[in-house]
Amino acid sequence: MMIDLNADLGEGGANDSALLQLVSSANIACGFHAGDAGLMVQSVREALKYGVAVGAHPGYPDRENFGRTAMDLPPETVYAQMLYQIGALAAIVQAQGGELQHVKPHGMLYNQAAKSPPLADAIARAIRDVNPKLVLVGLAGSELIRAGQHYGLTTRQEVFADRGYLADGSLVPRSQPGALIDSEEQALAQTLEMVQHHRVRSISGEWANVVAQTVCLHGDGPHALDFARRLRAAFAGRHILVSAQLDAEA
């Protein structure tokens, strides 16, 4: 069995360099919700140094709220913003001798696209128009995954180690109780359940089916690195190989 481990980087976090030695994919902020040109170059160089797959992490133009506030933008505006952000990072990766591998939207853009077909369509279409070989990373079972499949993109269905789930397989909004899992033991158990048995227990107690092809590790918590190491050890003990090159993707 294989699984991809990804982390959102280039957002000013202190753990970026250490996380790059534990994950297989890096999603690098493209300057809208966080990061800037210099940090993008630095992050790409470090990711390539450690042999980590580099992806774009485009978000809403909302630095004040870290891209976590809902916005009601026309799909064509979102399409243009995706071209701008993905294209910028792709150029930086190419200039550093690498190749952009995937795209994972950030924050509220990611969450809204999970449930909004027009928004998901704009994002998937932009990715296809930049490079149809790019992998689209989205919430497992979401509209974003369906849009990517519609446009012929390779998709990678994502689950979250430290986020609570609703009965429909969507994430508990950050504004609600149960959105974040503070217990490392609970997060570890949830991740293994999703990866090995393709299901997650929702905050209401029901099981929701999920397809786990990549696991997101949030690197901004006080115990983020310890948890990442524990998760890697748990995978190794169960003969689960961590790699960005999955055998079969959706």
From Swiss-Prot:
Protein name: 5-oxoprolinase subunit A
Family designation: Belongs to the LamB/PxpA family.
Pfam families linked to this entry: LamB_YcsF (PF03746)
The keyword tRNA processing belongs to this UniProt entry's keyword annotation: no
Chain's role: Catalyzes the cleavage of 5-oxoproline to form L-glutamate coupled to the hydrolysis of ATP to ADP and inorganic phosphate.
A GO BP annotation: carbohydrate metabolic process
Reactions catalysed: 5-oxo-L-proline + ATP + 2 H2O = L-glutamate + ADP + phosphate + H(+)
Assigned EC number: 3.5.2.9
GO MF annotation terms: 5-oxoprolinase (ATP-hydrolyzing) activity; ATP binding
